[in-house]
Design a protein with these regions (language model features):
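Bacterial Sec-dependent signal peptides at the C-terminal "C-region" and cleavage site
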Residues: 7-19
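Extracellular, surface-exposed repeat architectures
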Residues: 46-47, 52, 56, 364, ...
């Protein structure tokens, strides 16, 4: 590995002085292997140029380009350490992540019947999946040379994840890939979304590229007006640009980290998992076994996986005022997914005042901020948007098993425009497992759009316990603004839950214990119903302490899940609650200021300022 201390020593020698502030010059530090920041860098501040032009990158230039006619340019693939052309699944052209040749060019197709699964001992993964293709897709696949199909990849959306598999064979309208055995809850089915990438016969649109691995070259169709091509691929196998290990009190300022590889494989990627975000094995920058490692005013862009991971036994530190965009997966991961009782976990990490946008470009199930097994962390005042899956996720244990994920704070974040109607079962803020002392507050969440189901705003999933969710504003979600799968003793208080498409509130498992307390909330809708249909009766049967909530249907009709509000309130004992117009200034235009005469105030609702959510005002 390249050691950061060598770069630091060179910078200090050039400055002719002894100091703990290492000023890195403008320009690129181009890596071919991971840079290690160890204990010999403790106490140092690595400060890039004030304009952010100091960049640590794994970029490898592609070119020169040859005009092949027909709107196609070609360039040789760079050679790897073994002297052979590298294989790449990512290409950046003129600062833009270019689109791989794709079938279809936009959108998706679906199998015509449920996918057939058979045991296949000869395959590396043990199972073979066979898809029946729609005729228009089969025609394109049949047109591709058989020798190239091995370099084409099927992307198959399975609820909350995306499987990625090279094509094994094609015949008579059926395409086969090798993968892991399907879980009972994530079968590949007729209506699921699919596409095929890196298929020569789909290389037909401006801005697309095709990796001809057999010929050792890249083909590209320029966009209109794109005369000069400045193109890069990530260095082969370089998933992590910088690894910090056993260091303390290290700060990185004004540095850009760019262009890491999505996976270490030398050929077409095979990826499948049974849980969202579980695939993620790396990040552009990883911190392990270190204390107070801080990233301030840094930029993470064009990554292959997550941007930043505070991984194992990290104490303190975090990301402050950073920007992360064009991400292969998500923004920041904190902690590990595995944990044994008694083990130290990552703690005290902050993600504060950051912009995390446009993620999931290679791994669509990437999360904006993912807290696994970690405690006492804070995710505050961030803007998180443009993802295909969840905004902030907290916890990694199912049911009521003991968990080290405690006392985390998710507050004052603006989380919006996620899901993009491609994955399912997501939340603006998602929690999983016991999480005593965790607080989710003062967030603004909107634009959560799922494919088949589960575009939730606030989502307490399996075994969530001991969590307080208060002072949040949620609107424009596909499913409930608040949904609890099952959990115990959570508190949902003083939230504004507005106009979800299919229902406003859901509790989908009734248990013997108290599931939650729901008090002083304002719930208003113009479409759907008060409760999501498949959770409606369970929401009534679950042990919930309902108190002093305000419910309002925009047309004023006192219809409440097929009955009257008075009847419903009497059955569930929603004590002190009312059906009344909350008197917002203009809720349809997202002005949620309350009139002084609002009946919500008489119920004890405490107004909060949604404009405080998101990055702090500059």
């Amino acid at each position: 590995m390249v050691r950061m201390c060598f770069i630091a020593a060179a910078a200090l020698a050039a400055a002719g002085c002894r100091t703990n502030v290492v000023r890195l010059p403008a320009g690129d530090v181009v890596l071919t292997e991971t840079m290690l920041v160890g204990s010999d860098s403790s106490g140092k501040v690595f400060r890039g140029a004030p304009d952010g032009s100091t960049r640590i990158t794994g970029a490898v230039k592609v070119g020169p380009w040859e005009d092949r006619g027909g709107g196609v340019r070609a360039a040789k693939l760079p050679l790897g350490a073994d002297g052979k052309p590298v294989y790449t699944e990512t290409l950046f052209v003129n600062g833009r992540r270019a689109s791989r040749a794709r079938l279809p060019d936009s959108g998706y197709f679906s199998p015509t019947v449920n996918v057939e699964e058979t045991a296949c001992p000869s395959s590396r993964t043990g199972w073979r999946h066979t898809l029946s293709l729609p005729p228009e897709v089969a025609e394109k696949v049949a047109a591709a040379p058989a020798s190239e199909l091995a370099y084409a990849q099927l992307l198959f959306h399975v609820k909350w994840d995306v499987a990625r598999h090279p094509i094994v064979s094609y015949a008579d309208g059926k395409l086969a890939v090798d993968g892991g055995k399907m879980a009972d809850w994530s079968k590949w089915e007729k209506g699921d979304l699919c596409c095929i990438e890196n298929l020569r016969s789909a290389f037909d649109a401006p801005g697309e590229w095709f990796c001809d691995a057999a010929a050792g070259e890249i083909l590209y169709r320029p966009l209109p007006g794109e005369e000069t091509l400045e193109a890069f691929i990530p260095c082969e196998g370089l998933e992590t640009l910088v690894a910090v290990d056993r260091a303390s009190d290290v700060t990185f300022e004004n540095i850009t980290f760019a262009m890491s590889a999505p996976v270490a494989a030398k050929g077409p990627t095979t990826l499948f998992s049974y849980q969202a975000a579980a695939f993620a094995s790396s990040a552009a920058v990883i911190v392990d076994r270190s204390t107070n490692v801080v990233f301030r005013n840094c930029r993470f862009e064009r990554t292959g996986n997550y941007a930043l991971w505070f991984r194992e036994k990290v104490r303190g530190g975090g990301a402050y005022s950073c920007e992360m965009h064009d991400l292969g997966a998500g923004g920041v991961r904190i902690g590990l997914h595995r944990w044994k009782k008694g083990e130290e976990v990552t703690s005290g990490v902050s993600v504060d005042d950051c912009l995390i946008e446009d993620g999931g470009r290679f791994h669509p199930a990437g999360v904006g901020v993912l807290i696994g097994n970690a405690s006492d962390c804070s995710v505050v005042h961030n803007e998180i948007c443009g993802l295909y899956y969840t905004g902030v996720s907290v916890g990694w244990s199912w049911g009521y098993a003991e968990s080290p994920t405690q006392r985390n704070t998710v507050a004052f974040n603006h989380i919006h425009d996620i899901g993009k109607s491609e994955l399912a079962d997501m939340g603006g803020v998602y929690t999983l497992g016991m999480s005593f002392g965790t607080c989710v507050s003062n967030n603004v969440i909107h634009g959560v759009h799922s494919y088949s189901y589960g575009g939730w705003g606030l989502y307490t999933d399996e075994g969530s316990e001991g969590i307080t969710l208060e002072n949040n504003l949620v609107y424009d979600t596909d499913d409930a603004s608040f949904h609890q799968h099952y959990g115990r003793d959570n508190v949902v208080r003083n939230n504004i839950l507005v106009d979800s498409s299919s229902g406003q509130v859901a509790v989908t498992r009734a248990e013997d214990h108290r599931s939650l307390t729901c008090e002083r909330n304002i719930v208003i809708w113009s479409k759907g119903d008060a409760f999501v249909k498949y959770g409606g009766t369970k929401s009534e049967r679950a042990k919930i302490d309902w108190r002093r909530n305000l419910w309002w249907r925009a047309d004023g009709k006192e219809e409440f899940n097929g009955t009257s509000f008075a009847d419903w309130r009497g059955r569930v004992k929603d004590e002190g609650s009312v059906f009344a117009d909350p008197l917002f200034a203009d809720w349809k235009s997202h002005d949620f200021r309350l009139s002084p005469d609002s009946p919500a105030l008489k119920l004890g609702f405490v107004p909060f300022d949604p404009s405080l959510a998101g990055r702090r005002k500059r």
